[in-house]
Amino acid sequence: VLDQTDFSNSSIDAEGFRANVGIVLTNNSGQLFWAKRIGMDAWQFPQGGIKPREPLEKAMYRELREEIGLLPEHVQIIGCTRDWLRYELPERFIRKNSRPICRGQKQRWYLLRLLGDENAVRLDLSDSPEFDNWRWVNFWDPVNEVIEFKRKVYSAVLSELEQMLKAPSGLQPGQ
């Protein structure tokens, strides 16, 4: 698993993509953790920016703690996507008054297995929580439920991560 990246002083690259880690958390039934953005009718996987010079795995664990209250001992890393996956933001989401302009996200995605009790999940540990609700969903449901501009990335992420779950020590998706 690639763990180091260098964004010098900005997490936005020369092409305008913000570096980000995404988290796909599975339970022992092969379902996926699905979180509702605070105050919105929008559901997604946890994700967040990578700080300059921050190793990917460290960023993932930081986001895991900030967004859903889990610690490294609560999860097992099953794998990570091989490459950066990108999506462009629709025009209405681009902040044109900030520099550098962020026109989208480039993400590395981690597949994690929850160890132990789901009661460890806490959405209220951050000063500015991202989510106000969560649920377990069937493996492929997020592709159709996420906001439209993220669907292609979600499909690619789940297609790649599904292979890791099918490995001898993994779960079968949807079981």
Model regions: which residues?
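Charged phosphate-binding loop/patch that engages nucleotide di/tri-phosphates or the phosphate backbone
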Residues: 139-175
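A conserved beta-turn-beta hairpin within the catalytic core of GNAT-like acetyltransferases
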Residues: 39-41
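Active-site beta-strand termini and strand-to-loop segments that position acidic
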Residues: 25-28, 37, 112-114
